[in-house]
From Swiss-Prot:
It catalyses: GTP + H2O = GDP + phosphate + H(+). One of its GO terms (molecular function) is GTPase activity. Keywords: Acetylation, Cytoplasmic vesicle, Endosome, Golgi apparatus, GTP-binding, Hydrolase, Lipoprotein, Magnesium, Membrane, Metal-binding, Methylation, Nucleotide-binding, Prenylation, Protein transport, Transport. Regulated by guanine nucleotide exchange factors (GEFs) including DENND6A and DENND6B which promote the exchange of bound GDP for free GTP. Regulated by GTPase activating proteins (GAPs) which increase the GTP hydrolysis activity. Inhibited by GDP dissociation inhibitors (GDIs) which prevent Rab-GDP dissociation. Its cofactor is Mg(2+). Its EC number is 3.6.5.2. The modification Cysteine methyl ester is found at C215. Widely expressed (at protein level). Highest levels found in whole brain, spinal cord, heart, kidney and lung. Belongs to the small GTPase superfamily. Rab family. This is Ras-related protein Rab-14. A motif (Switch 1) lies at residues 42-47.
Length: 215
């Protein structure tokens, strides 16, 4: 029986990190479903989503792990950092506390992922300009000082959501092309021409769980 060909050439593993309530699940849903969830449930542990994109003529399947922001789940969610090719680190532009905690999230990301993991800083809820509590300029400076990509976005309107995931993928693909990302390394977070059945995952991690409400 003939094997069904893949309709993508690479798999990139992403994680989404940041405080509870910054809109991580809403960003994931907007990217994968093109819809805004007004009542995004709190993520319990992790949630999973996928989407196929195109970068430089290559079809790439993004496997995206949305991690819980509550401190009580940090021990569980840290295990999902390993083997991530990209990380979206999210804060809420209307809540300075979520911005102030970025250094802690960045420390975890740098300690638990490989040195070539692409990290993009996302200032979510850009549609709430009147309630802004973190300036674009200071967040951009933080990103530049720490070697991060940076965008402000809105999970509600969809502004820059596509770009957030695509810009990280472009950088990862660039790292593959220039040889700075070793695809043979288990922690690279990238699979090229995967041999597992379609729908297979990069890891054998348990199914994510959700409950409650919030974002």
């Amino acid at each position: 029986m003939a094997t069904t060909p893949y309709n993508y050439s690479y798999i990139f593993k992403y994680i989404i990190i940041g405080d509870m309530g910054v809109g991580k699940s809403c960003l994931l849903h907007q990217f994968t479903e093109k819809k805004f969830m007004a009542d995004c449930p709190h993520t319990i542990g992790v949630e999973f989503g996928t989407r196929i994109i195109e970068v430089s003529g290559q079809k790439i399947k993004l496997q995206i792990w949305d991690t819980a922001g509550q401190e009580r789940f940090r021990a569980v969610t840290r295990s999902y950092y390993r083997g991530a090719a990209g990380a979206l680190m999210v804060y809420d532009i209307t809540r300075r506390s979520t911005y102030n905690h970025l250094s802690s999230w960045l420390t975890d990301a740098r300690n638990l992922t490989n040195p070539n993991t692409v990290i993009i800083l996302i200032g979510n809820k850009a549609d709430l300009e009147a309630q802004r509590d973190v300036t674009y300029e200071e967040a951009k400076q933080f990103a530049e000082e720490n070697g991060l990509l940076f965008l402000e976005a809105s999970a509600k309107t969809g502004e820059n959501v596509e770009d957030a995931f695509l810009e990280a993928a472009k950088k990862i693909y660039q790292n593959i092309q220039d040889g700075s990302l070793d695809l043979n390394a288990a922690e690279s977070g990238v699979q090229h021409k995967p041999s597992a059945p379609q729908g297979g995952r990069l890891t054998s991690e348990p199914q994510p769980q959700r409950e409650g409400c919030g974002c």
